[in-house]
């Protein structure tokens, strides 16, 4: 499946969860989820956009009740969990929608 189609599926998943996705001029990060708003850095290539979108969607499933994760002492653990889940989300999309 091409990267554009993967993006469409990820966007559909985000919107289905009530998340608004925007491209933003981030300098310190590639993606950020705050409540139901998800920002992706606007200068990324499509594969990085897809990965970061999947990563932030993963946070919405895994850590919706954890408050401010950036300042959490468990931040590294949460990031590793979201990384693993993002890879699973991408693999599911690639295999389920061939």
Task: Set out the residue ranges of the language-model regions.
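Active-site hotspot residues in diverse enzymes, especially metal/ion-binding acidic/histidine motifs
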Residues: 1-98
